Amino acid sequence: MNYSALSTDPIKQKSDCLVVGVVEGKTQSAVWTELDQQCKGVLGKLLSSGDISSKLATTSWFYPQEGGVKRLLFVGLGKEKELSEAGFRKAAKSVMQSLSKSGAANAVVALSSLTLNSLKAGWATEQLVIALESACYTFDNMKSEKATPTKVSQVKVAGDKRDKSAIEAAIAKASAVAKGMSLTKDLGNLPGNVCTPDYLAKQAKALAKEYKSLKAEALGEKEMKELGMGSFLSVSAGSDQPARLIVIEYKGGDDKQKNHVLVGKGITFDSGGISLKPGEGMDEMKYDMCGAASVFGTLLALAEMKAPVNVVGVIAAAENMPSGKATKPGDIVTTMSGQTVEILNTDAEGRLVLCDALTYCERFKPETVVDIATLTGACIIALGNHATGLLANDDKLADALLAAGESTGDRAWRLPLWDEYQTQLDSNFADMQNIGGRPAGTITAACFLSRFTKKYRWAHLDIAGVAWTSGKDKGASGRPVPLLTEYLLGQVKG
């Protein structure tokens, strides 16, 4: 998709489609008023009759007989004074879905008719670009017949002259984020027989080859064993696919800047191991590597926009399968940190790979560490499919992540990490057990991880409820790439 900023009258531009916002009431934008005059009052009549709707996120088409615009695409914004950021995102998603399904090859967006209630032009442009890229995304890599590509290929965002530089910067930023989200979706949507730990390692090296600011390496099981990663290796013990610890370094800042580390859970298929999952819906366990996929996507976005920050991605990739060599309930393993874990449930495997990866992070002397994982079904029970679960040992870090989520609409909700929950992990035979029972499952999982993060500021993002969608629209969401990218851009010094 080709995007550009436009600071001239959008109505005077020849285009296949002009996007215009409509509010409830008689007072409309200057763009609407001019268009209505050109159409001899027809638009006003259609609005009054309800054929053009001002209801939030509804879209209406009109084909003018005169002028250089072939189509008008109106999007309802509701009551002008009530339009919020969330409402704008909803409207942006709706209008871009309509545009992507149309026959228009190019479009102009009349931004002034959309940015109400002091919504900034740059921010609004970001939402529009990401909404259109998401609407145009398809995954047909594994199909013999490919989907018909979206016809629209060029979009001009028309705004005030003084906003042109902000719009251009927003286009560059949002395009990078959208590209990162697409990579995250692609990796997540791949089946487990293709996307293996070794496949992820190869993708990391391919990404580093594409961007000079990235470098990648992957440790095999021999090196991991030498490092003492007994917990990590216990997960891959039953699989024919060897585990990989993948490290991708992005150096956009100077040598004085500390590293921010992202740790991604990369279980490429989770059968549950000996604690086997039910068969229904097990196909969706290919999405158990979406935390790792989001690390890939975030690093791509940062490299694409040449962000002046240093970030290390650590990906714990393994496949969890049952076999005669698989770890059994009751087995005790020694982690890289030296702490021992009694494994009561082999389906609580994400924390077993993450704990060793978190210990490995110490060598980077990080400013912050954020792990991203489809960790607990309990998070879906607590927060549904809208918010990422957030737990942290540092309030400032937690607040920065929450703010990034609010800004991008990729929101998170903080849960407590109190010492009182730690006792649920007590074991009679090891330093801890890997499950804490049904109560507060998301919290006790984070409590487990917290025992391996004593040497740095750390936050845990449980994306079990937001990483993918089930049903007829099944597919990876690309979250939380917007949140992570926004957070890391906020860490740029100076």
Curated annotation (Swiss-Prot):
It is an enzyme of class 3 (hydrolase). The active site is at K277, R351. GO terms for cellular component: cytoplasm. Gene3D superfamilies: Leucine Aminopeptidase, subunit E, domain 1, Zn peptidases. It is found in: Cytoplasm. Its EC number is 3.4.11.1, 3.4.11.10. Mn(2+) 2 binds at K265, D270, D288, E349. It catalyses: Release of an N-terminal amino acid, Xaa-|-Yaa-, in which Xaa is preferably Leu, but may be other amino acids including Pro although not Arg or Lys, and Yaa may be Pro. Amino acid amides and methyl esters are also readily hydrolyzed, but rates on arylamides are exceedingly low; Release of an N-terminal amino acid, preferentially leucine, but not glutamic or aspartic acids. Keywords: Aminopeptidase, Cytoplasm, Hydrolase, Manganese, Metal-binding, Protease. InterPro entries: Leucine_aapep/pepB, Macro_dom-like, Peptidase_M17_C, Peptidase_M17_leu_NH2_pept, Peptidase_M17_N. Binds 2 manganese ions per subunit. Belongs to the peptidase M17 family. This is Probable cytosol aminopeptidase. It comes from Hahella chejuensis (strain KCTC 2396). The gene is pepA.
